[in-house]
């Protein structure tokens, strides 16, 4: 009798819990939610973070299979990793204007980061990045390096050196940690 009551109670509690649980979204619906939140973060949270950190421009550089931990949070839901070399450039023009979000890559990176490099038109990828930075003339350029916070230390030594060599001297002095 006690077993019968116990299993009946267990059955009803399980049934009640399953009825109260939200439905699990399908893959497409999940992707839409993820991409929506990415757009929301980029348009509302990121401008305030950049303003508070006094960073006009944030450059995220990552290579396929060796991603910066932060870049993954900016990739669209359908991407699992960076492709070849993915460079995202986020520029805050100030005066409460929306952020400019560019991909120095051969393709758009989702709906947010628009393609800003055509190899046939612009030549080398690093040169194009330097041109885009010079055109915007930011006061402070954040990149992901840090001595104290591992997740903010995503740029590799090679990528850092190539980035540094690409910039003219006056812009090199403006590079800061984006931690």
What is each model feature region?
Residues 1-4:
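Positively charged n-region of N-terminal signal peptides that target proteins for export
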Residues 7-16:
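Bacterial N-terminal signal peptides
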Residues 19-179:
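A composition/biophysics-driven feature that prefers long, compositionally simple stretches
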